[in-house]
Structures are given as C-alpha cells and as structure tokens.
C-alpha cells in the first residue's frame, strides 16, 4: 500500500513514532506549516493543534484531504471552506477535559483558601455542559455543592441533565451563583452564538466576593466590561483565555486571582489523549493501523488515581500546585505583563510552544 504523506505539528507527542512505518511523516513547528510547505511535501493529511489556522490561505492548491487537530476545540478551522472543498476534518473532543477541570478545581480551592470561604456557602454555576462542564459538575457533586447549569443547545435536544444539577437560564446563573465557570465553544452564528456572550449586563448581576473562571475561549467574555466591573466590585477572576491572543490584557491579568497563557488544557496527559484521537481518526479515515504500543505505554505510566474529597482539599490543592505549577505560570504572566505588545505576544507563543510536561493529579 502506498504510504500517505502526513505533515504533523511536532507538539503532538509520539505521532511520528506511531505512524512512521505506515506513512511518510514530516514534523514541523506550527509556524512553519504554511501553504508552500504543504505543497513542497505533497501533504495529503495534516495533524495540528490550535496554533495553526486551517483555511483557504493554508490549503488552496494542496493535496490535503484530511485535517485533524489534537485539541478539543476547532474554532481554528474554517469549516465552511473545508466542507466546500470536501476535506475531512476532525477534532479531539474531551481530550483535555480533565486537565481543564483541574484548572477550575485549583482556582476554586485557591479562592476558598485565600478568601476563607466555606464550602457550604458555594453555589457553582457552569455555563456549557459539554465534556468539561460535565466533568467539573461530577467532581463538585462529590463535595455536595449546589450546582447550576446553563446549556440551551443541550436543552433543545431534550438532554436529560443529571439530578445533582439544577438547570437555569443564563441571567439566573449570575444572580444565584458566587462561583461561575464557562466551558462553551467560541461560535459566531447559530441559535446560540457565544462570542461576547458574557457582557457587563450579566457581570453586573454578580455578588460581591464572587469568583469568575474563564478557561473556554477568548472572546466569550467582553474583557473591557469585566475589567470595568472589577474596578467597582469585589470580584475574583481566574483567566486562562484572552480576547486578543497572543496579546493579553496586562491590567486584567495583574488584577486576577490567577492568570495564565491559555494552558489550562495543556497537561501532558491531555496531549497524549489528543494524540490518541488523531491517530484513531487517521486509522478510520485511511484504513491504516498506527502502532499504538509506545503511546499506550506512556499513557499507562501517567494514569491518575487521586479522588476529590471534602477532607483532603488542602492536600489536593498542594498536589495540584506541585504537579501543574499554575503559580509558576502566573508569576511568568505577571512578569510578561510589563512588556510591550510584541514582547507579550512573543512570551505567550513561546510558553505555549515549549510548555513543560505537567501531569494530572485527579481522577473522578
């Protein structure tokens, strides 16, 4: 069988080793994956992460017929263009759900500890009940916390929400909850677009001393509205995604309880999961079988087994800090906030490109 020519982002771990005997794999830095590069290497398949914009500029006049991203989100795909060209496209839903859930848990534990909040006084609001939202709810259900959920598309599908969550409208989430986390995709069309979903009108409903966690996509929250609210209200924020990435709002970062450069989903475990989903999509589409042995061995090496319990929250907070090093990322973010726009952008791209291996702690 003729070997398939695959161009892959070298940031997808083990993809070369798993495909080398059944395809011609060319690894490249995301910034080098260009139209001319794809043409030069006669690429038929493309495996990337969210740092590569997949559109007409990238793919016109190439032989690419398959694109897979090792990330859960795919707002870096021009879906209309791909559909018009008949190019198959795949994402990796849920691959980093536990990674992001740990970020949410860490943020809430930090808020509880620094603000001396009692668990019984928390009402948790989850906007978006996909893979991440469901997992966050399952974790906090073990702590017997009141959980409120909003996800209109799921509701329209007559989805049966678990009995440990209360469904309510978006404005009710902001009225009832003192901890809110959003996990929606960034969409600009459809019945429920999420771009600029959370504006000053909603944010003004928040109670003083609330916590807002933003780890979905930049553009879901209107940052200027959020910062203006923070000037007049006591509000804690944990922000991982930014409106103008790779640039970020320095004032907002420095005013936050936690601010990071879009790395909530960057655990090593999550990246391995993303590789697995890309390989499965390649196998199913092309009918070739990758060698999964090395990837399976690596995934088994870093399986997590720690549970979240009321009586071990301090221990969990320490373990998450030791394993995920979010405070190190926050310190680097604050330091980078002193740079000019070009410097901040370079920092943001560099840390995401060369993010160190950080291992997950929790398992539901």
Where are the model-predicted features located?
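NAD(P)-binding Rossmann-fold cofactor-contacting core
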Residues: 143-161
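Glycine-rich adenosine-cofactor-binding loop
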Residues: 10, 93, 101, 120-141
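Rossmann-like adenosine-cofactor binding region
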Residues: 54, 156-250
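Oxidoreductase and adenylate-handling cofactor-binding alpha/beta cores
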Residues: 101-117, 141-145, 276-284
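Rossmann-like dinucleotide-binding domain for NAD(H)/NADP(H)
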Residues: 209-364
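Phosphate-coordination loops involved in phosphoryl transfer and adenosine-cofactor binding
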Residues: 3, 120-123, 209
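Phosphate/diphosphate ligand-binding glycine-rich loop within oxidoreductases
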Residues: 44-116
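N-terminal glycine-/charge-rich "phosphate-binding" loop or analogous flexible N-terminal tail
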Residues: 1-43
